């Protein structure tokens, strides 16, 4: 898969790469790009019985703290609210434990993609 080029398609391409990489790690996709008024969740996956709400972040370089530093408290709150909305719409998942992951993606010096997967990146209070 060529490295991300078009600014317009960067987010979509990053999410496709992330989905492929995470399924390679043994997770299965439940939903992509869940949208609601409260926010958006890039990927919702199952890790065995755990429902995983995943934020995907792509950065060209780390000059602004990298991909993971961009998930601030405001973004975390929006993800938590969107996850609550998802669970309200999908009662079949109510029994599952949930977690919030962040998958950072950045090019290395040879333009290959480096993945940094933070499981349980933050918690809902």
UniProtKB/Swiss-Prot annotation:
SUPFAM superfamilies on file: Restriction endonuclease-like
Stored Gene3D superfamilies: 3.40.1350.10
List the Pfam families: UPF0102
Any one Gene Ontology MF annotation carried by this entry is: nucleic acid binding
* NCBIfam families the record matches: PRK12497.1-3, YraN family protein
The text of the family note is: Belongs to the UPF0102 family.
Instruction: Supply the PANTHER family for this chain.
Output: UPF0102 PROTEIN YRAN (PTHR34039:SF1)
- Could you tell me what this protein is called? UPF0102 protein ABO_0585
Name its species: Alcanivorax borkumensis (strain ATCC 700651 / DSM 11573 / NCIMB 13689 / SK2)
């Amino acid at each position: 898969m060529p490295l991300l080029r078009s600014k317009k398609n960067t987010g979509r391409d990053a999410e496709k790469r992330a989905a492929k990489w995470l399924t390679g790690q043994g997770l299965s996709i439940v939903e992509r790009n869940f949208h609601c008024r409260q926010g958006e969740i890039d990927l919702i996956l199952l890790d065995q019985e755990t429902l995983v709400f995943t934020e995907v972040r792509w950065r060209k370089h780390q000059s602004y703290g990298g991909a993971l530093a961009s998930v601030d408290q405001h973004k975390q709150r929006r993800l938590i609210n969107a996850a609550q909305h998802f669970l309200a719409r999908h009662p079949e998942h109510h029994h599952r434990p949930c977690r919030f992951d962040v998958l950072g993606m950045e090019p290395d010096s040879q333009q290959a993609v480096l993945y940094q997967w933070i499981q349980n990146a933050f918690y809902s209070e």
